[in-house]
């Protein structure tokens, strides 16, 4: 054996001597580095190919994936990579939003793609354990509903001492305040739910379909809430400084439109003070999307908020009101409508609900039945074809058509016949107010605006600490109502 080793050693020495003689020391050194690099690359690929869901075993985990290495999941409808890591990332995201059943279904859908069944089994057990730690929310009539108007993006322009300042100071919230509110509610264990999660429709023994309390399952310490935004129309008095009907930098520092960004997600258009037109997160929708992306456990099964729109100035910042047919060419007007429809579809695809905020924005409670019926009809004729069907009506000025008594009469019949089943007023006197009737649902909403933050911090102390939220750029004292 020693003799063989000696012979091999002599041959190896002669081999290296020949290489050095032919190529020189520098080239031989480069050659050695290349050989070592290739060996390390091969070793790395081999290790990755053995990584499964739990970190060992399984195939198809190379992160460099081509289009043919993806699959459209029947569970989520998303295009996902056919890799263990891709599966786990998506399943983890679903589990983080408390959608354990969908996460388990996704694992089952992909399970056959992996060699290591033991790792799949362990991961499924982990999901089952998390699911078991959730319990049904005891009473969905105990769910608060907070709301905002369009957010102040530029406090210098909004609070500039003109005739609109007091209104903005009373009824608007700044971006800084909104972000702080979301952070505090998240820290306190609040979880955003869809308003439809609060209820479910069931059939009775006599064949009737009625509303009952919904099934919301959350871990201990978590509590549900609903969020809505009023007047997501981007009215011209807020965005058009020179009065020509189009948004400009002379506006009062608000976003002026919802658009579909390059990534396919809904975002804002906004004019900077210097006239630069930009897109980004300047209002509730994209800001909340950003927050949920960072904190997926803030959203229950992908729930988002409600956007309430009127009709007298078009929707989402687009010139869809019939009066614009006189000012635009047919092609220009049709383009506005088409874009507004596309944005509406994208909004709903992202998990948001679009609600009616009336057509002309007057108090439904104090109006006579004839005026209300006409308003509902205008909504159906002009706005519903753009935003689609909705069963949620958010009362303008928060003015309900009744007190605590049951709905009845021509006003209710008109709204019911138009498809509305969930009705939201404003009631900040208590943490929550919900009525669930056989054929409709009512919920009170709490305004988190300048007036509420400044004048009634004790009424919202279970939600936030208003004193630490209020923006230093907000003029004080905030006017009284």
Please provide the spans of the model-predicted regions:
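Metal-dependent polysaccharide deacetylase catalytic core of the NodB/CE4 family, i.e.
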Residues: 141-161, 207, 211, 219-225, ...
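C-terminal active-site subregion of NodB/CE4 polysaccharide deacetylases
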Residues: 104-120, 128-198, 211-227, 235-239, ...
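N-terminal, intrinsically disordered, polar/charged segments of Gram-positive cell-envelope systems
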Residues: 51-136
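Hydrophobic membrane-insertion alpha-helices, especially the h-region
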Residues: 31-45
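N-terminal Lys/Arg-rich, disordered targeting/topogenic segments
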Residues: 1-26
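Functional beta-strand-loop-alpha-helix junction segments that form "active/interaction loops"
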Residues: 199-204
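Membrane-interface motif at the C-terminal end of an N-terminal transmembrane signal
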Residues: 42-54
